[in-house]
Structures are given as structure tokens and as C-alpha cells.
Amino acid sequence: MGSVRTNRYSIVSSEEDGMKLATLAVANGFGNGKSKVHTRQQCRSRFVKKDGHCNVQFINVGEKGQRYLADIFTTCVDIRWRWMLVIFCLAFVLSWLFFGCVFWLIALLHGDLDASKESKACVSEVNSFTAAFLFSIETQTTIGYGFRCVTDECPVAVFMVVFQSIVGCIIDAFIIGAVMAKMAKPKKRNETLVFSHNAVIAMRDGKLCLMWRVGNLRKSHLVEAHVRAQLLKSRITSEGEYIPLDQIDINVGFDSGIDRIFLVSPITIVHEIDEDSPLYDLSKQDIDNADFEIVVILEGMVEATAMTTQCRSSYLANEILWGHRYEPVLFEEKHYYKVDYSRFHKTYEVPNTPLCSARDLAEKKYILSNANSFCYENEVALTSKEEDDSENGVPESTSTDTPPDIDLHNQASVPLEPRPLRRESEI
């Protein structure tokens, strides 16, 4: 049964190591139900890669070519540049050849190819196919060298000149429009929108929260920026229906409006793990053994073009660090704020993070330590980071009276010296 299901529902290509189907809970599909269906180990790739590309292949699509040709403009905009240039070059060459053949046939039927004929030609100086082809190029591109020209002898030739001029304008307009649309696509804008390599779970305001960080490497703003997230998980319903990828929304503040962000400096997106969260029943051990993928999406309008762009990434269960927080990247200077992107992906461990699920924490099954200890650990983490930077060659601005063998993590009474970089600003 497992092999049949694999062949039937394998819609994702296996290009990299992915998640493994180990245990499916009938109740909610997240490995915490009482009734579990055990299946054989199965490797599965990401649904959305780290660079944002969807790892999906479409097969057995009926009338695919006709559907793509029916929307030829979108097809030309979406294809690669090399194929786009090939299509446009072929469009020009084929149009020149077609009208060259038409003018050659007109000259042939009128007898202009006969050198002994002294009557007026339909197109002067067109006495071979090569000459007709050159006349076609000169007409469509409006070069006009002056040797070949249409006369009033043949109305058909005059009509074909007018018709070719109109066709040439249509081809030029289509090409210019497609090239401009392709150049204006905000796809490359995503190269300067970054997500942190790992997501983290830690305490914030007395509650367990799932967090990840987003940043904008350009100084130009992303207008109306907002974030979304979904959890993808295979599950079996209570009726026995197998859903390969069940998509569950993760609340990042849509109802309250905090999903809309002012992305000038890196921002940490926070999902509060409450009773409505799909992670509510998962502890650290459950996360370590879980099989799911969290897809995160950042949308907004490019300030320069006012076109909407979407940046995507994903986190597997093994890319979620429990009991970690991100290192500060925003520091306040005298007249400005400084962003240090070398710390963007770095995290530090918070030892007193509860290992239980958010449900157990809400039901008081886990006793939290004093909140002040977290503040001290936060400052010590920053102190340790600055000491590491000093050892790597960064000039030290702190006191050097402390012996090198003192463990700052165990010396709660050691006062912290003032730092040149202030705390991370709250956004």
C-alpha cells in the first residue's frame, strides 16, 4: 500500500534530502494524536526550496502547447531570454522571407524576371529572389536604399507594401512590449530580499513563539509589505483520506494588522503558538521528530515600478532551532542606525527555554524561571559575541581587567561594562 501511495502522490521531484514520513496522527496529522498510523520511511524533498522556487513538476497536461500558444504574450515573458531572442529573430526572418516570396511571385507573374522585357516593372530592380528578399527587408525596416521601389504598375504590389508595413509595426510593438514587460518583472528584486537560514522557537512575553527574520538589502522600500506563512504536512483524516500536503495557515497577525511590516531594517516575524496554532501540541522532542514544512512568504510592491513581488522560502522541522534567539543586527549610533548583516543568520541559545509544548505551558505543567535571568543571558550573549570579535582582530572597547579564565555564563554578579553598540531597537 505504501508503494502504491508513493507512486500516486509523488508530485515533488527528489533533488535534495527532505522530510521523512514516519508517523501520521489520525487526529490532526502532527504526530501527537493517540491513534497513529506507522508507515515506512520515505524521503521527500521540499515543496518550496530555500531560494523560493516551487519544487513541482507537471505531467500529463492535456493540450499544453495550445494553452501556452493561446497566451503567447505571457509565454514570451515567462520563458528564458535565449528562447525569447530566438522567437523574435525567427519572427523577423520569417516575415521577411514570406513577403520576399510574395514580391518574387508578383515579379514572376508580371514577367519582371525576364531581362528582355521592356515594360514597366511592378517593383523596380527586382529581377531575382535575392532582390525580392532585400526589398522585403528594406520595406519592413524602412531602410530605403533607393535602388528598389514599388511602382504604380501593379496595385497588388502597392497593397503588399502597405500590408507589410503594418505587420512590421505589429511585430515591433509586440517585441518591445514583451521585452519591457520582462525587464520590468520584479523577479530579480527577490535577490535583495532575504530570509534567515533557520527559524527559532523561544519565549517572548511569556509565550512560546515561532520566529524567523526577513531583511531588505536595498535602500529602496518595499511598499505595502506583508508576510504570510503556511504549514505543509501529510496527514490522514478521520475518514481515512490521505492528504499528501495539507496546507494550514499560520497566524502572523493578519487579524490585528501586524502582518504588515515597515521593512527598512531586518525584522523578526513572530507567530504566537496559541491554541489556534498547528504547533500548539508540539514539544521540542516532537519538533525534532516531526515531518512538516513551513512556507514563509513576503509580498509587497517594488517602489521603482509599483509592481507586486513575492519572495518565498521554507523551513523544515530540522531547521527550527528550539530555545534560540537571533543576534541583534540593528544598533543605534549618534546620528543614525546601523545594520550589521554579518549577524543576520546567527542565533544564540537561551538555556531556560521550556522544552514542553505550548499546551503544557498554558496548563501550568512547566514552571518558568525568573524573567530577569533571560535578560542577563541576553546581555551575556552579546558580551560573548563582542569578546569573540575582539579576539578576531576587532579593537576592544571594554575593560580587560577580567581574567580570561572567568566563565561569564556562571558569574551572575559580574557587572557588564558599557558597550559602544547599544541594544537592538524595538520595531
Curated annotation (Swiss-Prot):
What's a single GO CC term here? Answer: T-tubule
**Activity regulation comment:** Activated by phosphatidylinositol 4,5 biphosphate (PtdIns(4,5)P2).
Start-end of intramembrane regions: 129-140, 141-147
Chain ranges sitting on the Cytoplasmic side read: 1-81, 179-427
Which keywords annotate this record? Answer: Cell membrane, Ion channel, Ion transport, Membrane, Potassium, Potassium transport, S-nitrosylation, Transmembrane, Transmembrane helix, Transport, Voltage-gated channel
Span of the annotated motif Selectivity filter: 142-147
Compartment(s) of residence: Cell membrane; Cell membrane, Sarcolemma, T-tubule
Q: Which residues lie on this side of the membrane: Extracellular?
A: 107-128, 148-156
Motif PDZ-binding, per the record, lies over 425-427
Give membrane topology per the record.
Multi-pass membrane protein
Q: Which InterPro entries match?
A: Ig_E-set, IRK_C, K_chnl_inward-rec_Kir, K_chnl_inward-rec_Kir2.1, K_chnl_inward-rec_Kir_cyto, K_chnl_inward-rec_Kir_N, Kir_TM
* Name of the featured protein: Inward rectifier potassium channel 2
State the protein's purpose: Inward rectifier potassium channels are characterized by a greater tendency to allow potassium to flow into the cell rather than out of it. Their voltage dependence is regulated by the concentration of extracellular potassium; as external potassium is raised, the voltage range of the channel opening shifts to more positive voltages. The inward rectification is mainly due to the blockage of outward current by internal magnesium. Can be blocked by extracellular barium and cesium. Probably participates in establishing action potential waveform and excitability of neuronal and muscle tissues.
Out of the domains of life, which is the source? Eukaryota
UniProt PTM comment? S-nitrosylation increases the open probability and inward rectifying currents.
Give site residues, Role in the control of polyamine-mediated channel gating and in the blocking by intracellular magnesium.
D172
Question: From which source organism is this entry?
Answer: Bos taurus
Q: Which residues form the signal peptide?
A: none
Residue list for modification S-nitrosocysteine: C76
Q: Give one GO molecular function term.
A: inward rectifier potassium channel activity
